[in-house]
Structures are given as C-alpha cells and as structure tokens.
C-alpha cells in the first residue's frame, strides 16, 4: 500500500471549480488531476448563479472535498459564491481556495473575511495549489498523491 493512499479516497477527491474562463478552467482541471489523481471528480460551474444553485443542492454525503472559486466572475459573483458556500450547512466547512488575477488588497481581504482558506493567483499553478493542499492536509508534504512520469 502506498503511503499516499490515505490522502486519496478510492473514488478520488471531489473538487468543485467555479470558473467562467474556459482556458483557466482547463488549466485548473489539469493541475487538480496532476496533484490529486485522475480519479478525482471535478464539478465545474461556469458562473455564480450555477455555482450557488449547486451549493444549495450539495448534502453532507455528496459535498465536495475542496472548492476553487474564481473571484472575478461577472457582477462580483465570486463573493456571492463564497457567501453561499459559508451559509450552506453542507459546504460551510469545505476548504475553499479563491483563484484570482486581482491585485487589490481589498479583494483579497474580503475573500478571507468571507471564509476563503487561501487566495491563489491566476493562472493556477501546480506549485501554489500543491503548497496549499499540503497546508490544509489534503496532500502529504513528500509530494503529490498522484505521481506522473516525465519520461
């Protein structure tokens, strides 16, 4: 048994990604699967309205293990998604990483005030996501739960 198996449920990790840009969504899904394994389920919402609706449908049994939310959705949608997540009985305790290209201190501060676990810069990098996953205990410090060969 690989020592990393305890970090990977047999069915993979369930990640909820809220991203309106198709290219950024593709990058995020790729990085998530590199770090957490191909068996990881990535649920993608393309806008705040869709995300808030899905958050309202999650239960304790099917909630995501991690949420990644684009802060700069149209109409300040990222903030509404954070608010909905923290107001949801099922999702209130789910680690939530904000991904953003915003350099405004106010945006970053408000993200943390609304319950973000971390704020990561766009485009999402493997190194930054890995560091935060280790920090919250979703990955062992020795490396990723899923190893890919570079040969």
PLM region spans:
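His-Asp phosphorelay/catalytic-motif detector in bacterial-type signaling
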Residues: 12, 38, 62-65, 90-95
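Acidic, metal-coordinating helix/loop segments flanking the phosphotransfer/catalytic sites
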Residues: 44-66
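Non-catalytic signal-transmission and effector/linker regions of two-component phosphorelay proteins
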Residues: 1-16, 22-41, 60, 121, ...
